[in-house]
Amino acid sequence: MSSQHQYMSVNNTSSSRVGDIEHINFFRSGHLSEHIGSLCLSSEYSDVTLIVEGQRIPAHKVILAASSDYFRALLYGGMREANQAEVELQAPLQAFKALLRYVYSGHMGLSMLREDTVLDMLGLAHQFNFQELEAAISDYLRQVLALRNVCSVLDAARLYGLDALMDYCYNFLDRNATDILQHDSFLQLSVEALQGLLERDSFFAPEVDIFKAVCNWFNANQLWVKSEGGQAQVEKILKCVRLTLMSLEELLTVVRPFAPVTPDMLLDAIQEKTQTKSTELRHRGLLLPEENVATPKRGARVISGDMRSALLDGDTDNYDMERGYTRHTISDAPDNPGIVVRLATTTIINYIRLLLWDRDNRSYAYYIEVSVDQKDWVRVIDHSNYFCRSWQNLYFEPRVVQYIKLVGTSNTVNKVNNLYVVFHAVSLEALHTARVPPLCNGLIKPVHNVATVELSAVVIEGISRSRNALLNGDTEHYDWDQGYTCHQLGSGAIVVQLAQPYMLSSIRMLLWDCDYRHYSYYVETSLNYWDWEMVADRTRDACRSWQVIYFTPRPVSIIRIIGTNNSVNEVFHLVHLECPAQVEEAREDPAAKKQRPSPQENRLNPSNGSSSDASRASPPPAAEGPADPPRARSLPPAETATEADEYND
């Protein structure tokens, strides 16, 4: 057999082409990395010498360049170092050797290194643009973070611009504020890190303890304090300490003897403390991200209102007309105590989730105020003139609070002895969340459809075999008998109430379109069921199938659709309603649209509807359409009807 024949027949298997050599196990078993790793710190095949802290280290250009853009530019990018046999680098020696071992082997045992070496490694990974290594070291530092090293890790993160690691360190310090103030590592903080820490509202500890720790920091860093410009920095740091949060006794006995605090600073603090409302002072508070702090487990309790035990028990299923809620009598008195929840301590929150009693179609109006001392209150939610129901998702700017006051101003149904209107709240949660939706004038400006059962929207007027047919999102399964909501022309309407007021600028609807009929209608919105604003007038248009309506952004909690014409019979049929409109063009700012689509252009948009819309194209003349659908034989159990008869055709 010839040598050529032997070569051509290597690895001739059904899974490989003739001449292919598959030695994958050579790479998987680590043989290649072992061979490359053996070249680390070896002069064998070396073509460059790196000088670090005076020590010469043999290296290989191609391996360095393949591992990092920094070395690729340095050794092959036309810089003078590309033609030098020796290249000097500014780096700590031990950390650089560990970096080389990583470059040549892909392995690094961080747990075997000293903490200062690990931080040096982080700096080298940043300097030489080893992004994966930088991320891996950052993850490792998160895992081993402790009081002894958090300050040095924070300084390193600030130095290298590692925002995620820096935030993690600050959050760790927030959670351990009292302990870190007494730890020796606090004295090692850089000026910038110290100022950043003191500026945080979430660095929660008694202000007098913070002041004492800052004094200790000054004493431990006297060389810096006495340096040029040091005194100016001292004043900046002292301004980060919130003297107004201390008692007068603490100001006079603890702060006053400290030399850097001038008499003017002390007097200004006393004046601000005595003349400023507590709600206007900058407080510190406990921050527990994404955790409900209004629970008995966290020390919260209801201190005002009737049937207090229900509000914070977490049970949002078992409630009826007799139990499962906390209540208070609604009155016009400006000092109405309402329902008050006291948190265990001052806490930072920006989100309240509230469940209003919703076993019928009643609506409530209310407002929410917060306080740190139960004396000065600030209103964070004002729905006192808006109809609201069921679950309320309420967002506001982060605030430090200890008291939450819920005051009802209206209940559309309930009265006690026909005299007193009562406000009922089933559940309340309070937390700080990073998942804040877009807001406009304090109201949610939704991106996704909020007219859904899941978000507590409800059809309060209109006839349907299924109570939630209009809001269930089903735009495919409807026919002559089911899948729509309707009302008699000239009598009644279709009315949808959202759970709470939203800032809306568009609505999309699907008119019943199983034949070639067309409709006319108009749409109004309201906040209280008495005052209505028209947002669409299509009473003179022949409309069918999908309808997209744009209007100037406004608060909306109730939507009313009134049909004025049906080309086939005397009933207006609606299959689906959503707001805002879930089409790309509807998400564009209406103010930026040079020309809105006309009603005729919106008659039918197959791309926005179901796959069967193509068969529902422009209708032929009415005379060519099919006959009216048969009338249903019987009316289903009472739903949300407003008429005595059913209108399904």
Model-predicted regions and their roles:
Residues 104-188, 195:
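Post-BTB helical module
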Residues 159-162, 168-318:
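BTB/POZ-protein C-terminal extensions
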Residues 248, 252-346, 357-360, 427-500, ...:
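Disordered, acidic Ser/Thr/Pro-rich linker "stalks" and the adjacent N-terminal cap
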Residues 1-65, 94, 98-115:
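N-terminal BTB/POZ boundary and linker segment
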Residues 335-337, 356-435, 487-492, 511-649:
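Trp- and acidic/polar-enriched beta-sheet ligand-binding modules for extracellular glycan
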Residues 48, 58-65, 87-91, 120-126, ...:
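Conserved, well-structured core segments
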Residues 69-84, 106:
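Cytochrome P450 catalytic domain signature, combining two hallmark sequence patches
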